[in-house]
Structure formats: structure tokens, C-alpha cells
Regions:
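Conserved donor-binding/catalytic core segment of Leloir-type glycosyltransferases
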Residues: 6, 205-221, 227-230
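Nucleotide-sugar donor phosphate/pyrophosphate-binding loop at the beta->alpha transition
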Residues: 114-116, 123-147, 190-194
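Nucleotide-activated donor-binding/catalytic signature segment of Leloir-type glycosyltransferases, i.e.
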Residues: 253-270
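Short alpha-helical donor nucleotide-sugar binding micro-motif in glycosyltransferases
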Residues: 269-270, 277-282
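Aromatic "clamp/platform" in nucleotide-sugar-dependent glycosyltransferases that forms part
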Residues: 290
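Short hydrophobic beta-strand element within catalytic cores of glycosyltransferases
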Residues: 307-311, 321
Length: 396
């Protein structure tokens, strides 16, 4: 019988909170205690307020943060917390490099719980690692993935990577990113009728094609590389690109904007209501990432009924895009094709845009409806755990 589920992760951020809230509520409704163990309040480089996202089901552990050679955590309280919580199932998230997660793995036999890893990375991510670091990563990944009893995977691409390293008897559960979908769906639908007023508010010409890219201003988001492609589009002079977000790559992006002369607006950090406004006045969602495991913004765009244009490095593109029906996936390795897809999007008819919006909403409901996903996930894991208990060996 499953009485306790524990998720060990680096932080609770505003984008994941609705998912954790949903897990807690559903687990509580079927008599399961759900707990989140946190390694830190807020990851370095992010600016949300921990006081607004903290929850009664979450425990902030004491520990130490390391920034070299990569960001890492060592939370010595995790073992005591696990002893007290007596979990039947443990999920670790964030990174398999975290020392805290290593401690959880090391104690799974002693404390008798299976460990699942929430893996969102995929084989098509571009990383700025040198060959030595790549080799180290490969060795560590191969060792640690073989230790996990199962995985939460975010889509087709992430499962492909997992299967390369996991044990043959590993269990798999599809866990897409989830958001507070009703807020995006209902608010954006209402605001669509106020497009002229919203464009005037943000000083955007009504006849311009508006692209929205909510993203950190960082190298991995590929904004600087996408602007070179956009600059070759036939309708580039009728485009306004909105980028709500902050980051340490801002100067480089501003330089690229100056070089191209494109109408690209760096809007800085924006609250959720402002971001939904921006979605509602936009024509298309664009995410040109060079590395992006499982971005939530794609799911926000689906629930707002937008057509999408994303790169092949975006990990959930097989789930969020039906090629030509609600958008396009482009490859930086094929520059000509990428520019052609930008042109197709910008010159698309009103009829296609309406059909694409309907398709986006259908995909959102199919893959990213929290009411369906959370119940299926918990019920499947409980059934799986029950079978393991009956077999007489909880930890394979």
C-alpha cells in the first residue's frame, strides 16, 4: 500500500507550483501524504519570490550550494527527512549531478523505497561543454541512470535519451509540464477581443506581425542566432518581436538587434498578467532555443491558442507541434528551410491561423490538461508500487 510519496528537487518555482499543488490535492484525496523536499529557496539567476510559492507540503532543507564546476547542492538533512517521512516512492528531480540526489539513491535499499528520476533532457540539446566535460557527463549519466528504478519523462525525445542509459526493467511515466491552464485559456480568450487596445497600450502597429518569445536572455535560448534568420525573411520590416525576460546575455542580444535593425523589444521581467496580455496581442509564438529540455512557455502558447515556431533543440516539440497544422519546427543546420518556414508563418492566411489556433488548443487539452495528467500519473505509480510490494521485493 502506498502511504507516502516524496519528491526531492532543487526549488519550487512559480511555473511548477500548480503541478505540485495538484499532486498534493489528489494524493490527499486518496489518503497519500505528498511531500516536496527543497534544496534551496530560489536558484541563482532567477528573481521570483520564495514567500509567494512556498507551501505547507514543502520542506526547505539546510545545505550548501556549490557553483564550481557546475551548480550543485549538498543537503545533509535529506536522509533524516526520508527516515521520518517513510516514503513508499521517491522521485528525484533537478539534476542527476546533485550530491543530494546521490544521497537519496545511496539509501534506497536501507530505507526500502524505489527511486524515480524526473528527466527532461534530450539528445538534441546543444551544450557549450568541452570534450572533457562531455566525457565526464557521459560516464556519470551511464552509472546513475542504471541506479534508477524508473523515470518520469517529458516527451518522446526525453524518453529516447533515457532508454539509451536505463536498465531494461526500468519503469516509465509520461509527465509533461503543466501550468495553471484555466488562467491562460480564459484570460487570453477574453483579451483577444481587445487586440487593438492592447497593441495601442504596448505601442505596436496594428498591422504588424507580432512574435512573442518569453525567455531568459541567455545564450541557450538562441535569440541572437534566430535574429540572423529573421533578418532574411521577406516580411522582416513588418515584424515586431517581443521578448519578456531578463538575463546576462542582454548586451549581446542588444548588439545583434542594432546590427539587424529589426523591431525587437526587450521588455524585462513581466508578471504573469502582463505576459498573458502579450500572448493575446501576438500572432505567433517563437522559441529558437539551442538547448531547452521541456519549456513551459510552449505549453502556455498552446493554451493561448497561438501558432508556434520552435527549433529542433526544443525538447517537447513532438508534443506541441503538428507540422504545418499549428506551426513549424526549424533546424539551424538548414538555414534556407528555416527562413522559408519563417516566411510561411508570416504570410499565412487568416483561415490557416484560425485552424492553427484550434489545433494548438486541441494539443493542449490532449497532453497538458492537469486534471487528466495528475490522476493518471499517481494512479499508475500506486498500481506499480502495489505490484512490486506483492512480488516481495520493493527495490529491484
Amino acid at each position: 500500500m502506498t502511504n507516502s510519496i516524496v519528491l526531492v528537487t532543487n526549488e519550487i518555482n512559480p511555473y511548477r507550483k500548480s503541478f505540485y499543488d495538484g499532486l498534493y490535492k489528489y494524493c490527499e484525496s486518496i489518503g497519500i501524504k505528498f511531500t516536496v523536499l527543497l534544496m534551496t529557496k530560489v536558484e541563482h539567476g532567477y528573481n521570483w519570490d520564495y514567500e509567494k510559492v512556498k507551501s505547507d507540503y514543502a520542506i526547505l532543507m539546510k545545505g550548501k550550494h556549490f557553483s564550481f564546476p557546475i551548480s550543485n547542492y549538498l543537503n545533509w538533512e535529506v536522509l533524516e527527512d526520508l527516515k521520518n517521512l517513510k516514503p513508499d516512492i521517491v522521485i528525484v528531480a533537478g539534476s542527476y549531478f546533485y550530491y543530494t540526489n546521490w544521497m537519496v539513491i545511496a539509501q534506497r535499499y536501507k530505507l526500502n523505497y524505489p527511486v524515480y528520476f524526473w528527466s527532461e533532457t534530450h539528445l538534441q540539446e546543444a551544450r557549450a561543454y568541452n570534450s572533457f566535460l562531455l566525457k565526464i557527463r557521459e560516464v556519470i549519466r551511464r552509472i546513475l541512470y542504471s541506479k534508477f528504478d524508473g523515470f518520469w519523462f517529458s516527451g518522446k525525445l526525453s524518453r529516447q535519451l533515457i532508454e539509451r542509459y536505463a536498465r531494461k526493467d526500468a519503469k516509465y511515466h509520461f509527465v509533461p509540464n503543466l501550468i495553471d491552464h484555466t488562467t491562460y485559456l480564459n484570460t487570453s480568450a477574453s483579451l483577444r477581443n481587445q487586440r487593438a487596445e492592447l497593441r495601442a497600450k504596448w505601442n505596436i502597429p496594428l498591422d504588424n506581425e507580432v512574435l512573442i518569445t518569453p525567455a531568459r536572455l541567455s545564450w541557450v535560448k538562441g535569440i541572437h542566432t534566430f535574429l540572423d534568420l529573421l533578418n532574411e525573411a521577406a516580411l522582416r520590416h513588418k515584424v515586431t518581436m517581443l521578448i519578456p525576460g531578463t538575463g546576462d546575455f542582454k548586451d549581446e542580444i542588444e548588439l545583434k538587434i542594432k546590427e539587424t535593425g529589426l523591431d525587437v523589444r526587450l521588455l524585462g521581467y513581466q508578471q504573469q498578467d502582463s505576459v498573458i496580455e502579450l500572448y493575446s496581442l501576438s500572432d505567433f509564438f517563437v522559441l529558437p532555443s539551442l538547448s531547452d529540455p521541456n519549456p513551459l512557455t510552449c505549453i502556455e502558447a498552446l493554451w493561448c491558442g497561438l501558432p508556434l515556431l520552435v527549433s529542433t533543440h526544443v525538447g517537447n516539440y513532438p508534443e506541441v507541434i503538428q507540422e504545418c497544422q499549428n506551426g513549424y519546427v526549424f533546424d539551424y543546420a538548414n538555414k534556407t528551410d528555416a527562413v522559408e518556414k519563417i516566411d510561411k508563418l508570416l504570410s499565412s492566411s487568416a483561415e490557416w491561423r484560425k485552424s492553427a489556433a484550434d489545433c494548438s488548443l486541441q494539443l493542449a487539452n490532449k497532453y497538458y490538461n492537469p486534471n487528466n495528467v495528475i490522476k493518471r500519473l499517481v494512479d499508475d505509480m500506486v498500481r506499480e508500487n502495489s505490484r512490486i510490494e506483492k512480488s516481495g521485493h520493493k527495490c529491484p
